[in-house]
Amino acid sequence: MNIVILGTQWGDEGKGKIVDMLTEDVAAVVRFQGGHNAGHTLIIDGEKTILRLIPSGILREGVLCLIGNGVVLSPPALIEEIEELNAKGIPVTEQLRISSACNLLLPYHVALDKAREAELGTKAIGTTGRGIGPAYEDKVARRGIRAMDLLHPDQLLEKIKKATAYHNIQLEHYYHQTPLDYQSIYNQLMEFREKIKPMIGDVSALLGNLRRQNKHIIFEGAQGSLLDIDLGTYPYVTSSNTTAGSAATGSGFGPLYFDRVLGITKAYVTRVGAGPFPTELTNEEGKKMAKRGNEFGSVTGRPRRCGWFDVISMRRTIQINSLTGIVLTKLDVLDEFAKIHLCTAYRCDGEVVNEPPFDQSLLESCEPVYEEMPGWQTSTYGLTDYSEMPKEARNYISRLEELLGVPITIISTGPDRKHTIVRQAVFNQVITAKG
């Protein structure tokens, strides 16, 4: 069985924990888009691990972890991550494979990203400054350096020289930044080459072989659907396609081979950086939500904006991803709220609408229409049995299912792998559904 697991909001939904939990009986986990601009946090027996590029299956012995062609790969970030995991006794090089068609994220991409954000000032998009956007620009413009280029040093030197000269024109003459030295970039890549060369290969062919052996494969998305470059809250989006279609194009795996698509969503909503956020809470409730949920970026440390669950945007996410199931995370964050609110419509220019407008100027003016429900005001932290959950919490979950039309198959009640209620088996492995 082949399953896509992705975020349904603006990222930070808890994908890493869920992927890790489900990898017990899978052969491989695949990253198919994004870069090291988002982190997946795993907590196992109290020990925290943050992954930025390497798929979340790396903590399971024998699980292949594949970086697909849709990822933009920062060599220094990857090496740092490998060394951190090796220090914990995890044999990364035995489990990790990198698509030879994967584009590399290089120093001039980072320099351009930072220069552009500085130029925009208060109108900045709010990128992480890690060079993701410029790296994807080079990919689309067909001047990108790919992992396979590391296997041909002489050709690589000429490509680096041309690309650096091209980007230095912008850096030096438009942004008034110090130009970069192509030889230094090349020398650095040669050092990385020796460390990652054995892991470079044909990920698409490897996936094909696993499929023919009827192995279970998870395709792990980064960020969230509302950050999709085409279907998200443009221009306040990331530079890749974060929706289910990207799992095929970003890995070289045919779309008809996918069996299920699981969407990860928090029991509330968060967002990092600029952009419209209809249900955002800027009052004490929002601060309480952020504090209880420890809402700070795992990579950047930036505080996240918080708000009530948005049914309208979630319906759009279900539609564009063809979700077959929902995983609800961080339910325990709502434990102390006396009242819970669900946004069931928007009021835009005096008109009640049930679809989120793509026009961002209109979306920014939309106000949420709320349905109020009683809170449970008792701890759900660490629960593993649905029948032990407070009635009000179960009512909240039932109402979400009713409004969304998709079953909530898994509920996360805490950060650890064990803090989980499985209501419906994902693979064919034996899992006792609770409730």
From Swiss-Prot:
EC number annotated for this UniProt entry: 6.3.4.4
Superkingdom in the source lineage: Bacteria
Top-tier EC class: ligase
Cofactor(s) named in the record: Mg(2+)
Catalytic activity as recorded in UniProt: IMP + L-aspartate + GTP = N(6)-(1,2-dicarboxyethyl)-AMP + GDP + phosphate + 2 H(+)
Cofactor note: Binds 1 Mg(2+) ion per subunit.
UniProt key word Cell membrane: no
Protein's recorded name: Adenylosuccinate synthetase
Native organism: Coxiella burnetii (strain RSA 331 / Henzerling II)
Record lineage: Bacteria, Pseudomonadati, Pseudomonadota, Gammaproteobacteria, Legionellales
